[in-house]
């Protein structure tokens, strides 16, 4: 290729030389026309010029003698003509003038030659680059050839290993044949002995011994398999314990940092106390100077100072309590370290696996008990001070209530609280405030009521959204005496945490559980679905109503309109009724509540709700909070401890009514005798006797019965189907309300929702499937708390991806309005876009968002603006996951028109139809491993509870040993198969059949071997 290019370049250069030589030859002409133009008269004499040039060249090459000889041969006329022509040519004055033109042409040709030389150099460089690429490709080809050769070598090795395995198999067959030969030899010997001595008792005993040895080998094999299985669980438990130790060390550091911050804050509080004391002294002096004789005011001021001192003392006591709990936490950490040391020492001994497993479980139970004792430790009692009032308005009136600090440290993840001292500010009278941390681990409730003060203690914790924050607004006309104010505040302050949402049962213990040892709850509808232990006490229907009563209070502000009065009276979250002295303030309370209620609700007074439910047909997309709870929240709990099997017919019917399945009672009321009837019923019985044709209704009933027979208390069982219809509004899918309401889909069914269930509910869009999947994951992350979703903007300056996950569809539309995309925000209605889909779904990216918003592709600035704010909102980790998803080879852009295709069984799979059905039934919309780790979304590619950063090299080596042990298990299984085949051949022998009737011991062993 390079030689062809060089030949082309040489030809081009030769052509240029010829052109230049021809141009020089034209200098001799004296014409005024361009010799290269088609109209030039020299075009015909160009040949003569070439001949003259050739003549000149030949003459220069000849010698003098040859020139003279040639001159003699030229005719005289020709010579004279040439002389005249040449002399006249030299005497004319045209040559110098025309020479300039030719010189210009020559210069132009020289320039063209230089440009061609440059082009030649460029072409040369390109040729060299192409040569480099060719060499690189040849190198890659060599590498691929080497890889192919390596693959062929591996294939040869695999073939060799296969042949070696076949030879081993042949060896085993040869051994079996040898054993058969030995067996025949033994049989011949037996016949000889029988003929000679007629005594075969010894031989029978040997045969029995052989049988016993074979059975012992089988038992040893089973023991080895059990030990290997226990080794796997032990390694998993060891790794989980390492993770727990790492978490405990991290929490220890956090607690130490918190302790240091609390020390600094205590010092700042002391400084504030000194400043307050100096301020009080100054005010006292001022009062003494201005109002002599008013000793009562001075005494009140002293009382106020004493109360402030008591407040600081309570803070110091709380700090000491936290120090004590930190020490307890350190002791528990030391116990974990000791337990880890014992595990490391005992992990190499094969015979102590089971004991180690038992000891680790016992130690974990002891640690869990120690942590539960920590949580039962009393919190410091609140020190309350009554406010003071100055009737003359000459001094600064102050109302200060002590901060109530309650620290609740869970088993593994104690939260930290950082308190900051605010800047000096003058504040108008503010309502009582209550602060709590999101996860409920550490709660700081502060009741501060000031009119004008120099300093105010604030907390950096997030404000609670509970009803305890909705207090009275003070005004100038609301100033009362000291005694009346303290009497009004007494009921509210005696229960400082009455407005906080309750901790779900089992939350603390669930954090103590081993992530490898937790029992994964799955729905199974097989033959043993309704088996319940006889001594197991189940939860009754009134208990479910009681727990529902607790969550219904803080689910929605408008939900108070649907609650009966007796449930409000028994609820721990209700606001105490105003006293006669504070009747003036009730109007302010209702005004404040009216501002904070949901937009769909029309009233807040329970007496205004004349109709409990919507009467004009099915569930509409705008129903909102008009939907009430299906359960009677005011039931008595007299049969709380009665097992479901002993429930009467009326109780079972009422329970079915609460589950929303009351329509089947007319056809099945005669069939239901007690709770045992439902527990023993099969799928066919439910469909035939109760007439339940709807598959989701049968699934709902079976899940509810399974929950009654389970000892676990979960929050998803407390969410009924009316809550799910409101939840569809929150995630932006109100168009499916009718289908979900007809299917009576509740929180438990959401937890176990499968793809087939969604398809039966007529949800066929891929986007809507992913929306429901990520919404269920958000509910699992938040432990199915009814009010975990964020419907309204709170603090826009501190938006984290964990908070964006909780955004509803309406909140996302509010965010679009805040980023100047208000005209496109209504396009998200009914799209299923919520915070969980935006953050947790890798396939949902900016392009999908822009398509759903109907932003045209040509509006690049708008799309860039949306991408900037979208990436800032979801965080860096979610961006990385979305980029990884886009880089996958099978990535397809998520659109609103994509449909879910139901799986179809091929013709070859009809033999395994039952197995296929079971596998499809386990295909959950949201897999069980998603959202199980509370407080964070599961990391991509890792199992919940595992963190690869905490693994050491020893752990990885042990994992490799576990993989090797699995190979050992397979070898043992193959060896046991050979032993079983050998014993089977021995049993089929006629010798054993003959002696089975003679010897009773032989018959016993035969029966044992047949088992």
Swiss-Prot record:
GO biological process assignments: cell adhesion; cortical microtubule organization; neuromuscular junction development
Glycyl lysine isopeptide (Lys-Gly) (interchain with G-Cter in SUMO2) cross-link site: 471
Region Disordered, residue ranges: 420-439, 463-634
Coiled coil segments of this chain: 156-405
Keywords: Acetylation, Coiled coil, Cytoplasm, Disease variant, Epilepsy, Intellectual disability, Isopeptide bond, Phosphoprotein, Repeat, Ubl conjugation
Primary residence: cytoplasm
The keyword Phosphoprotein is assigned to this record: yes
Gene Ontology CC: cell cortex; cytosol; focal adhesion; plasma membrane; presynaptic active zone
Compartmental location: Cytoplasm, Cell cortex
Basic residues bias spans: 584-598
Modified residues (Phosphoserine): 37, 40, 434, 466, 540, 579, 601, 636, 794, 999, 1001, 1003
Residue numbers bearing the N6-acetyllysine modification: 322
InterPro entries: Liprin, Liprin-beta_SAM_rpt_1, Liprin-beta_SAM_rpt_2, Liprin-beta_SAM_rpt_3, SAM, SAM/pointed_sf
Domain spans labelled SAM: 647-711, 719-782, 804-876
Illness: Neurodevelopmental disorder with seizures, microcephaly, and brain abnormalities: An autosomal recessive disorder characterized by global developmental delay, severe to profound intellectual disability, progressive microcephaly, refractory early-onset epilepsy, white matter abnormalities, and periventricular calcifications.
PANTHER family, per database record: LAR INTERACTING PROTEIN LIP -RELATED PROTEIN, LIPRIN-BETA-1
Family: Belongs to the liprin family. Liprin-beta subfamily.
Domain notes: The N-terminal coiled coil regions mediate homodimerization preferentially and heterodimerization type beta/beta. The C-terminal, non-coiled coil regions mediate heterodimerization type beta/alpha and interaction with S100A4.
Protein name (record): Liprin-beta-1
Native species: Homo sapiens
Lineage, uppermost ranks: Eukaryota, Metazoa, Chordata, Craniata, Vertebrata
